Amino acid sequence: MPEPAASSRGCVLGFDFGEKRIGVAIGEHLLGIAHPLVTIDAEANDKRFAAIAGLIEEWQPEMLVVGLPSYLNGDEHALTQLCRKFARRLEGRFNLPVQLVDERLSSAEASQTLKQSGISGRKQKSVLDQVAAQHILQSYFDGLAS
């Protein structure tokens, strides 16, 4: 895991929002590489935002990236609006720019990545959301490079 001092190189936090858990990843604009960081395992908004505030204080990101889910055909579903609301709250509470990124298939890709690494079952469940956040953030970085 990178050190908190990485913020001087353009630290970015990425989020895979879920109603029960939020996966968090970290990366740097300079390197363009995302890493899984942590899973926030709380349903209550006050606990979620307290955990996020701690991460923002520790890592001092210059911006945030939030995955925006949709159906494969691009149509939005119920979680899409919740993610938009989450992104607006992040921007309002922390006064940081928030970029929404298409997250179709991020959880499936994360699960595949973990299986290829020999991680399955309960262990996979404990890190799946942060690896999905890693895929979302990496997608953002890859979009900048193209």
Curated annotation (Swiss-Prot):
SUPFAM superfamilies: Ribonuclease H-like. Its main location: cytoplasm. Keywords: Cytoplasm, Hydrolase, Nuclease, Ribosome biogenesis. SMART domains: YqgFc. One of its GO terms (cellular component) is cytosol. GO terms for molecular function: nuclease activity. Belongs to the YqgF nuclease family. This is Putative pre-16S rRNA nuclease. It comes from Methylobacillus flagellatus (strain ATCC 51484 / DSM 6875 / VKM B-1610 / KT). The lineage of its organism: Bacteria, Pseudomonadati, Pseudomonadota, Betaproteobacteria, Nitrosomonadales.
